[in-house]
Amino acid sequence: MNRITVDQVRDEAKNVRTLFFRWDHDVKPGQFVMVWLPGLGEIPMSLSYVGSPKGITVKAYGKVSQAMIDMEPGHEFYIRGPYGNGFQIESGRKLIIGGGSGIASLLPIADSDTDALISAKTKEELIFTDRFPESRLFIATDDGSEGFHGFPHEFLDRLDISVYRKIYVCGPEPMLYRVMQKLASMNARAEFSLERTMKCGIGICDSCSVGGLQVCRQGPVFDIEQLRNNPEFGISRTTYSGKRVYLNMK
């Protein structure tokens, strides 16, 4: 367990903040750490910046993430890891597809040969659009307040997917599922970063399992071929209490 001091914060959008800090550990793009706040709990988080300084971009969901949103320089938290496999990055032109705060996990693989499709519910919830030149940026919003009016999988019909050597995707699981189906129909090469309920991060509790695959050990990044016939991906998941719930695919 490593004690981390926040050096700098940057607000990305309402209820979204990046915490920058120093940590002398190598982290591969796509790997995650377990973030612990004493008295509140522990959650998995991917890094949005893996160089120096490192950074974690947080969206307020629960009590731990809300407490992190409220942090200022000098505040402390604890992390262990890194865990997981990370992205298999290849040279050549690539497309990253980020839904909501999921785009944060994809930032470390973006380079000058990267196009980005960034989506959110509304214009106000879009983040990191300033990281990409206009010629390489595509935007989609659920309500049409910015860019394409619709969802990422619908926008893909407008792109020539064949120009991309590989596509990398991160976001809410219903969005990942639809994008996976679309890319599979296009015979595209793609990797997906999954987020599931996670207690241990090291393969003991099995709460993060998706169709027999442990997200913490065999993921969180999976190749499209591992997911296209997975019986649970995009269908159901286990909550922190162990209850199985079905995802809203509307």
Swiss-Prot record:
InterPro entries: Cyt_c3_hydrogenase_gsu, Dihydroorotate_DH_ele_sf, Dihydroorotate_DH_Fe-S-bd, Dihydroorotate_DHASE_ETsu, FAD-bd_FR_type, FNR_nucleotide-bd, PyrK_electron_transfer, Riboflavin_synthase-like_b-brl. The keyword Disulfide bond does not apply. Pathway: Pyrimidine metabolism; UMP biosynthesis via de novo pathway; orotate from (S)-dihydroorotate (NAD(+) route): step 1/1. It comes from the Archaea. One of its GO terms (molecular function) is metal ion binding. Its cofactor is [2Fe-2S] cluster; FAD. One of its GO terms (biological process) is 'de novo' UMP biosynthetic process. Keywords: 2Fe-2S, Electron transport, FAD, Flavoprotein, Iron, Iron-sulfur, Metal-binding, Pyrimidine biosynthesis, Transport. [2Fe-2S] cluster binds at C200, C205, C208, C216. The keyword ATP-binding does not apply. Responsible for channeling the electrons from the oxidation of dihydroorotate from the FMN redox center in the PyrD type B subunit to the ultimate electron acceptor NAD(+). NCBIfam families: PRK00054.1-1. This is Probable dihydroorotate dehydrogenase B (NAD(+)), electron transfer subunit. The lineage of its organism: Archaea, Methanobacteriati, Thermoplasmatota, Thermoplasmata, Thermoplasmatales.
